[in-house]
Amino acid sequence: MHSLDLKEKFIDEMKLKVDNVNDHYLINSFYYERKRGNVEGLYTAVWDAKSDQLISQNFVPMGDSVRSLAKTDGPDRSALNDFFIRDVILKKDGSFILIAEDYYTQSRALPWNRYDYLYGYPSISPYYYNYYSPYSYGYYGRPGYYNNNNSVRYYYNNVLILNQDNTGQLESGSVIRKTQFDDGDDNFLSYAIMLAGGQLHFLFNELERRTQLLNDQSVSGSGKVTRNPPLKSLDKGYIFMPRYAKQVSASEIIVPCIYRNYVCFAKIEY
């Protein structure tokens, strides 16, 4: 067992990624200066598997430029408070891309609070996994927190993409702008990632003229965001569930969808 010196800072939801190419363990988390405070930035630690010791540890504060870019609304100071780490993509040289999404809920029963969301509200059992973790989507379903799906509205907004070197220092940042919400469940919200042509393609639903269109925005290695034409279904009535999608080859991704209460699968080729 090993301990990490957090220098009197607070972190939540540590994400562990195994780098088999470089024999490293990569640890990432958002951090705070005080308990229940605002998210200040990103904590990154790199542990070497061969020597069994810490190689680097950094607390990287997020400046006003990143906060202004990431926020949906509200002051810059609290801009990152609703962001959760979703993906970490490793590169051969040990650097990586970290992807976080703006997520929160609204309910008549309880107010939203990041700390309560992660570690449990006194009136809700911490063993209720759907409440405890923002990543427990279930199998094509997610029950409401309060046994009443209609009382919960889910919000999935901007996606923050951070390019970082092999010690966790920030090199560049980009944002995919989106606004998504739904009542009762979040099966059709969030995004999928498709790596094709040296770019990260983000696929997500967006409501346009009462029709859910599967949008495609791509991010290049330099951080440039390109808005591509929507992937319009040839047949009406199909609603995609991109969060459950799976890339199956260098040019193909399988996306589950719903059609007249049936689950089916669409194959998208690049």
Q: Predicted regions: what is each one?
A:
Residues P126, N130-Y145, N163-E206, R210:
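C-terminal structural cap/anchor segments
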Residues N22-K35, A45, D87, G94-Q106, ...:
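Short beta-strand elements that form the blades of beta-propeller/WD-repeat-like
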Residues V39-Q53, Y117-Y132, G144-Q169, N215-G223, ...:
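Beta-propeller blade signature
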Residues H2-L16, L54-R86, L170-A192, G221-A250:
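Conserved blade-ending motifs and adjacent loop-strand segments that build the rim/top face
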Residues R36-G37, Q53, S107, L170-E171, ...:
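Intrinsically disordered, low-complexity acidic/polar segments
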Residues M1-R114, N147, Y155-N157:
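Beta-propeller domains
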Residues K92, Y259-Y270:
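Terminal, non-catalytic domain-edge segments
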Residues R114-L118, T179:
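Flexible, surface-exposed loop regions and adjacent strand-edge segments
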